[in-house]
A protein has these predicted regions:
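Short loop/turn motifs at secondary-structure junctions and domain boundaries
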Residues: 74-79
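Generic recognition of well-ordered alpha-helical segments
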Residues: 67-71, 130-133
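Conserved GNAT-fold acetyl-CoA-binding loop/helix
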Residues: 50-70
Length: 170
């Protein structure tokens, strides 16, 4: 069986388990032990998040949150993706992740969300910038696809600040 994480050069690359963004802000791979804190954050922000996140109704209980994190861990182990908790001052304030990884075509798709009380501080932009840097420089990926609703003005603004260009809408 082939190793799940690899590049075309044969080097074995794996997304890092933790990425420092800047002072007090870092990305930490989601773990089952994060389920309670993450679910509480989802519940606290459910009305706000409902506007743009179609998966929201798939996480209605702590057990479903645990199941989601377990699925993310399996994707990570199989080289299909990675999901990070965005931590600001040690507390989870949202998530950012590679929803899919395609090492053969050197591309990945990113998605994210952040609590309403943490918006407008550049946290998502800085987190995505660090993740892009990791993907390009450490994982040898060349294409970073932002997966966000075109109606989500804040996400479109993040894409603009990161220098992304609109290539199409699916």
């Amino acid at each position: 069986m082939a190793e799940p994480f690899h590049s075309q050069t044969g080097a074995h690359n794996r997304p890092m388990e933790s990425l420092i963004v800047d002072t007090g802000l870092y990305l930490d791979i989601l773990k089952i032990s994060d389920a309670e804190e993450l679910f509480a954050l989802v519940e606290e922000n459910r009305l706000y998040l409902r506007k743009t996140l179609p998966w929201l109704d798939e996480v209605r209980s702590l057990d479903e949150q645990i199941s989601y994190i377990s699925h993310c861990q399996t994707d990570y182990e199989n080289g299909k993706g990675v999901m990070y908790a965005i931590r600001n001052g040690g507390r989870i304030v949202g998530t950012v992740g590679l929803n899919w990884l395609d090492f053969e075509n050197k591309s990945c798709g990113v998605g994210y969300w952040i609590s309403e009380h943490q918006t407008g501080q550049g946290i998502v932009t800085r987190s995505c910038s660090r993740l892009i840097d990791h993907c390009f420089n450490d994982l040898n990926l060349h294409r970073f696809v932002l997966e966000a609703s075109v109606e989500n003005v804040a996400s479109c603004n993040v894409a603009d600040r990161l220098g992304m260009r609109l290539e199409g809408v699916n």
